[in-house]
Regions:
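Non-catalytic C-terminal accessory region of glycerolipid acyltransferases
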Residues: 2-29, 259-378
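Catalytic core of membrane glycerolipid acyltransferases/transacylases, capturing the structured
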Residues: 125-155, 182-263, 273-291, 331
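Alpha-helical bilayer-embedded segments of polytopic membrane proteins, i.e.
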Residues: 9-59, 70-133
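Cytosol/nucleoplasm-facing, intrinsically disordered, low-complexity tails
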Residues: 1-6, 178-182
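Pocket-edge structural micro-motifs
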Residues: 170-172, 192-194, 230, 271, ...
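Low-complexity, charge- and small-residue-enriched intrinsically disordered regions
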Residues: 45-65, 166-167, 339-350, 354-356
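A short, well-structured juxtamembrane/interface segment
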Residues: 156-186, 251
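Interhelical loop segments of eukaryotic multi-pass membrane proteins
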Residues: 4-6, 51-72, 141-151
Length: 378
């Protein structure tokens, strides 16, 4: 028997469409604060839990029961949770304090004492000077970042890489006389797939000194430093932008990428973007590339080589709630993506103290760097 033809979808009535729009709006308003609270609370829980686990090893480093393997695992887990705590608690909290200290005294300006008024004026001058420098003068986040060697050498990064048993494999390194990813002599665009939930492979592999070690051991990547493209939101938060730009991060816009390539820099982008995180189900590698052609046009504009990068295990860090396309939750995610440039997938990692948290599962990551695809400038 032949398959029955699918029926046409019934169009929504005006009243149903209005109710649907109201539901999406309410979810957009309330879901993001709820998810942000969940992320902050569970990040705090994770760093507290890992600190308690690590503490006995610090007190009794030579105790027979404190083996080096267990001690290293405890340190690695602590630094992973500390990095998440910094991003999800310290940065938002610091931004809130920055805003309160700047604007709240203006409400009580008449009742402030002379010393408080003086201190507030000093703070306003300092904050205004920083904002002028950061957002009007300093343009490094729009032309490839800075990449401070000191920041990249921090032991934090090597511990995060060890937590995921991070390994970067370069195609062609095992062969004799092969060109490998060196390709031509121009700039390269490293195209990283998949995005995953938090792209731990990029953080552990390319934003750290781990990438320098890979280059030193490679025949084909010794002179190939990489700058990391990220959404503009990450370069707007005061102070946080300084950390970002000094690990080689820059705003991944068309003009910023062009300027970075014009400086002769190699850049890493994630063509699938935040939309790819919606498909980061464990045990899968869902890549969105057919509809993403901007990176190809970018390579054509500058004559840069395209270097494919695949991260195996990137989607295994978290459990992800599957959302049906067209559902309210799915549409809310699309609204967030259009407004902020990122999505807020419903996910969870390790369960600590009976609560699912944002702490990633300890899963191995293997990043494979392929040979470059030569592109002729048009």
């Amino acid at each position: 028997m032949g398959a029955k033809p699918e029926g046409k979808k019934t169009p929504l009535t005006p009243s149903r469409a209005a109710l649907d729009a109201i539901a999406v709006t309410l979810l957009c308003i309330f879901l993001l604060p709820l998810l942000a609270s969940y992320a902050s609370v569970t990040a705090t829980l994770a760093v507290t839990h890992n600190a308690f686990v690590l503490w006995p090893y610090l007190l009794h480093p030579w105790h027979p029961s404190a083996g080096p393997h267990d001690r290293d695992q405890a340190i690695e887990a602590f630094w992973v949770s500390a990095w998440m705590f910094y991003n999800l608690v310290v940065i938002p909290g610091g931004l809130a304090v920055f805003i309160l200290i700047t604007f709240l005294p203006l409400v009580f300006l008449g009742s402030l004492g002379p010393l408080a008024t003086l201190l507030h004026r000093v703070w306003l001058t300092t904050a205004a000077s920083y904002c002028v420098w950061a957002y009007l003068i300093d343009d490094s986040v729009n032309r490839g970042g800075v990449a401070s060697p000191t920041l990249r050498r921090l032991g934090l990064w090597s511990r995060i890489a060890s937590y995921f048993d991070m390994k970067i494999l370069v195609e062609g390194e095992e062969g004799e006389g092969e060109e490998g990813p060196r390709g031509g002599h121009g700039s390269r665009i490293f195209c990283y797939h998949p995005h995953g939930i938090i792209f731990w492979g990029v953080i552990a592999g390319f934003a750290s000194w781990h990438w320098k070690e890979v280059r030193l051991q490679s025949r084909t990547l010794q002179s190939c430093d990489v700058r990391l493209g990220t959404i503009s939101f990450n370069n707007l938060v005061p102070v946080f932008r300084e950390v970002n730009k000094n690990i080689g991060s820059f705003t991944v816009s068309w003009n910023s990428c062009l300027r970075a390539l014009e400086r002769g820099l190699n850049i890493l982008i994630i063509p699938g973007g935040a939309r790819e995180s919606m498909d980061a189900f464990p045990g899968t590698m869902n890549v969105r590339i057919r509809s993403r052609r901007g990176f190809v046009r970018l390579a054509l504009a500058r004559g840069a080589s395209l270097v494919p990068v695949l991260s195996f295990g990137e989607s295994d860090m978290y459990n992800l709630l599957k959302m049906k396309p067209g559902s309210l939750a799915f549409r809310v995610q699309r609204v967030y993506q259009s407004l902020f440039g990122f999505t807020v997938p419903l996910f969870w990692g390790k369960t600590l103290w009976g609560m699912p948290t944002i702490m990633p599962l300890r899963r191995p990551i293997r990043v494979v760097i392929g040979k470059p695809i030569q592109v002729v400038s048009t």
